Amino acid sequence: MIALSYKAFLNPYIIEVEKRLYECIQSDSETINKAAHHILSSGGKRVRPMFVLLSGFLNDTQKDDLIRTAVSLELVHMASLVHDDYIDNSDMRRGNTSVHIAFDKDTAIRTGHFLLARALQNIATINNSKFHQIFSKTILEVCFGEFDQMADRFNYPVSFTAYLRRINRKTAILIEASCHLGALSSQLDEQSTYHIKQFGHCIGMSYQIIDDILDYTSDEATLGKPVGSDIRNGHITYPLMAAIANLKEQDDDKLEAVVKHLTSTSDDEVYQYIVSQVKQYGIEPAELLSRKYGDKAKYHLSQLQDSNIKDYLEEIHEKMLKRVY
């Protein structure tokens, strides 16, 4: 008998998540309906719902609570994307126009708020105070991450610690919460809950570092946004930090000087120069950092009891660390 892949196993549950996402974004406001449908219909990998479901399936669980949790965390993620695109003035998201471009900035802000409110409303019936403490803290961290990102724009130098804090709040915290809340919903034992939570954190960190690498190495058709979007929006990420450090070791301070004087109105040639230097000097150390977190994630996964669900998590782990988009 051929074993199911994680996608085949999760497919009926992801279909249910998708159905409930569309139910959750219905409102009395035609404008919000259209804007929320715009972001939802642009697709997405549904990474967070997958981790909620698989973490919950490590033990017997109430599937309705798991679905609710998966839907709500995806709504939080969607809200953060809408707000991020507005803050960065990014025109594109997954190959489609961003909400603030397709509609307007006020609509984007209100749509993000609406999605957060729906996320909270959707899990209100879950009777577990620890669950709600974790969920609300996660939303706070995501909000702090948006403030971090605004504060760090065109603000070189950025410390390594500040970068790690930012990507934790931007990405890893939601994946960690997906694993943690899934385990909590299934009443998984304390030790296994710790390891699946840490797995979520580490793979989330690795995932975002890869995202930062791809921003320099991929192409617009694959990314659904222009190459070098991060630096064009003033975001100093690890590939650039590593490139600057490597060049300084060779007594070459030109890249650092360029980044220090970078503004939102800098010429396109300046950005092209930065991208070329990062490709040459910053990608390998960033890949090493991503693998470091990937190895930590693999360790925590190895501490879980053997099962088909663990195999699915290992499959996702391998795929996420080899992704090209």
Curated annotation (Swiss-Prot):
All-trans-hexaprenyl diphosphate binds at residues 84, 88, 93, 170-171, 208. Its cofactor is Mg(2+). SUPFAM superfamilies: Terpenoid synthases. InterPro entries: HxpDPsynlarge (IPR054985), Isoprenoid_synthase_dom_sf (IPR008949), Polyprenyl_synt (IPR000092), Polyprenyl_synt_CS (IPR033749). Keywords: Magnesium, Menaquinone biosynthesis, Metal-binding, Transferase. Mg(2+) 2 binds at residues 84, 88. One of its GO terms (biological process) is isoprenoid biosynthetic process. It holds the Pfam family polyprenyl_synt. It catalyses: 3 isopentenyl diphosphate + (2E,6E)-farnesyl diphosphate = all-trans-hexaprenyl diphosphate + 3 diphosphate. It comes from the Bacteria. Its EC number is 2.5.1.83. Isopentenyl diphosphate binds at residues 45, 48, 77, 94. GO terms for molecular function: hexaprenyl-diphosphate synthase ((2E,6E)-farnesyl-diphosphate specific) activity; magnesium ion binding; transferase activity, transferring alkyl or aryl (other than methyl) groups. Binds 2 Mg(2+) ions per subunit. Mg(2+) 1 binds at residues 84, 88. Belongs to the FPP/GGPP synthase family. Dimer of heterodimer or heterotetramer composed of a small (Hexs-a) and large (Hexs-B) subunit. NCBIfam families: HxpDPsynlarge (NF045628). Catalyzes the condensation of three molecules of isopentenyl diphosphate with farnesyl diphosphate (FPP) to yield (all-E)-hexaprenyl diphosphate (HexPP; C30), the precursor of the prenyl side chain of menaquinone-6. Large subunit Hexs-B catalyzes the condensation reaction and the final product chain length is cooperatively regulated by both the Hexs-A and Hexs-B subunits using the whole size of the hydrophobic cleft as a ruler. This is Hexaprenyl-diphosphate synthase large subunit ((2E,6E)-farnesyl-diphosphate specific).
